Amino acid sequence: QTYDNVWVKANEPTAASQYVTSDQCLGCHSAGGTGLQYDMTAPGTDTKLINLSPYGTWRGSPMGLAGRDPIFFAQLASETQTFHRDAAPMVENTCLGCHGILGQRQAEIDSYAKNGTCEKFSRAGVDAVPYPPDNPSAPLAHYGALARDGISCTSCHRMVLGKTDEAKYAGQPQNKCVEERQQELNPGLAGFAKTFTGSFLVGPPDQLYGLFQEPKKKSMKHAIGNDPEHNANVLSSELCGTCHTVHLPVLHRDQTIGHSYEQTTYPEWAFSAYRTGSTPDGPLPFGAGAQAQSCQGCHMPNKDARGNPYRSKIAAIQEYTNFPQAEHALPPADIDLPTRAGFAQHTLVGLNVFLLKMAWQFPDVLGIRRADPMLSTMGIDSIPTSENAMLNQAANATAGITITEIGSAEGALKALVTVTNRVGHKFPSGVGFRRAFLQFSVLDKDNRTLWSSGRTNGMGVIVDHDGAPIAGELWWKDDCSARIDPDARIHQPHYAVITRQDQAQIYQELVSTPPNVAAPTCGPGAKAEGQLTTSFLSICAKVKDNRLLPQGFLPLADRIEISRALGAGADMAEESGPTEVGDDPEYVNGGRDAVVYRIPLSELSGKPAAVEATLYYQATPPFFLQDRFCTSNSTDTKRLYYLAGKLDVSGSTQDWKLRVVTSGPVSVP
């Protein structure tokens, strides 16, 4: 972070200063910036303050860490070294268009201004630093600094949404290369859908958009030459959906043979009971769902645990009335800030506690500072704050679980485990390798395990009663010399009934490559004929997708109508649905799943006294990590190997899994 400072160039802002690093914002939008007033804080532990400011909550989130995420960069290395070596420039530019968005976009803006072309931003550009000044990357150091800043302030607060604003700013210098990206990644899509994969347009370089009306403008204008402007679109879910709908080329033999949806978090929400039914362009078919809630309503909380709206000033500046007198100060009408209701934390977390642990335990490896730059020792550092938000979300806002119908009959112990999805999209959602799974255990009176499905070893590998990995858990031989029967696409199916300890209910998405033929058929409904893959640009067919549907998930015909209203095709509606779940009535109706466990009493070494069911989550399952380590030998891969090998996962992520919810022991009658 020492190098990561990019400020507005001299004179009025131009497209050459479209993007700046977050340190240009933290002076005012982090708590404690004045040293006298402590707005945007709450009491923490040990007399320390929790920094609730936009910068304070963002900097330790996965969004703030996106430009340094070692998991992402290892995935990118596999894509460019093994999966799609000949397409590496396109792959790097595409992926860094979200994870390193500031650097990628500013580099394209500047290249277009210089020579009229959109030069692709590379992985090497992310590492560019200014010192020593004769190092080869020094001329590109400001792009590296911007990219490492992650999904930062000017990523979102310049975004324009809706046909009116897009028409106003289309064709301007800051959007020339974005429009080219839209044509490359989203051909044939229109309206909001053409902004998928982070392909949104932005406003001018001298405006920043926020939710509050009538903001005091002069402080920001004097500091960075920008006017803060009210724009209600920052409250819309489309602000998130443009990046959290990932539409990518399908590559086969170095050619694009189609496009597929790698990630459908936004459509999943738009098809659920949580949909608001409106966009910046107006209402959508079928209106709001019964539990309407925007993305920001969950991931950017503006209320405390009791439901009371946060009230705070939205910046920490040297006001006229509340500070000692000073010469040349602006009048109170210009710099005295009102207390606002609805102040939103930029928490922006899911459940990737593993990433936060890597950042906290190895800050020197990721090049970050742990200490709060403004509150210093007075404040709780941002990464623990983000981790606590994740743990709270896991425990209280993700899923429910119950065990019913416990009894013995026909020589077997039987129990019904029901899992309820409490989030506004599939669970898990986001990148397709995330997974959740059930552990169901039979216990004796001394709490010893007599039988268990879904138990793991210390590395998070799901194992059977003998400790051997169950089918599909590992993709490679231990020495990475070969895949394990890759054409068989071995995996755990979606179960309605489980009877053995080498069976486990895993909620996941699995996809396959195009088959090795000249003209493969890919897309919704295509038969899986290739190999299981973790490549984002090889998604030809789905093998399995039984991730828990959100409440109120609409039928296909309704999903297609909404998809078309958003400017997408029927394929988005189809790809957002489940795959290979059969006619399981407990699943297909949405919002829940139920599994019957039927255990032969002859397999129990003692008398069953209780049963227990627990839902676990893995952001980086063992097969995914193994595929990283076996498909690249890059510096980024070695870095992830080092971090994963030395990571202390004790506590919330013991045995490389995060407990979401548990039934606790339930007595066997």
Model region roles, listed by residue range:
Residues 78-92:
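Membrane helical hairpin/interfacial module
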Residues 1-7, 32-76, 112-579, 584-589, ...:
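Primarily the internal scaffold of c-type cytochrome electron-transfer domains
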Residues 92, 97-108:
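Conserved, well-structured interaction surfaces
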Residues 15, 85, 229:
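Short, flexible, glycine/charge-rich loop motifs used to bind or transfer phosphoryl groups or to couple energy/partner
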Residues 9-27, 88-92:
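Local sequence-structure signature of Cys/Sec-based thiol-disulfide redox active-site neighborhoods
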Residues 606-608:
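Extracellular Ig-like/FN3 beta-sandwich strand-entry sites
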